[in-house]
Amino acid sequence: VLGQRPGPSTGLPTYTSQTELNFALSAGQGEFTRFIAAPSDAEDSYYWAAVSLNISKKFRIPSILLTDKTICEGLFNFDIDSIREIKSEAAQVPAFPPDKGIMVKANSYEHDVSGITTEDPVKTVQMQNNRLMKTKLLAEELEKYETVKCFCNGKPDTAIICWGSNRPACEEIGKSLGLKVVCPMVISPFPIDAFKTALKGIKRIISIENNATGQLGALINSYGIKVNDQILKYDGRPFSVDELEAAVKSKL
């Protein structure tokens, strides 16, 4: 769980932000598949935490629940019985010491499929390709989940893009101003097909984030989707509905 607050260094440790999306996407040595979910409230957090654990077990990859202090220390209520069951789908049950009759190997060095250290160039390429293949398989797996949430009335031509704890306030603004609200639940692998489907008929995009550089907006731009305007807040405080409504109106 990565609960974001303002930095750098100690920063504002008791306030909130959305400043570590890029860090979550790139932290670590080398190139490998990772799963990142960005819940927008307690119900999402409960659900995607279970999905994250399942995906890590099934694909043997790290999962990050990218949240923020607003959610981490917020008070929510929801019907826990409404959350559909997430069944474990681990391909294999990992072995743990001191299980009898097995050998447990954990090797951070490059290794072959048997876990034996190797520096062979052919095997190195094969193992790297195997790791990267998980990205495609994971993207296919995620098609059965609601990886992008949408909220709208009618057929608006302007959309608000948000993520994390900004979603509830954006949804309220969307209803009052007649805008579509699009909120990705998954950051990596980014659900670009579902995201493009959500933006059908949209001519103008406004990105709303709690950071200074528009990190989600930059990620969206990298997929060839133009973000027309940004509303960025980075004083450590979450958006209030009133200030956000005024900011959105100024962009329309």
Predicted regions, residues:
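Glycine-centered flexibility motif
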Residues: 11-12, 20, 27-30, 95-100, ...
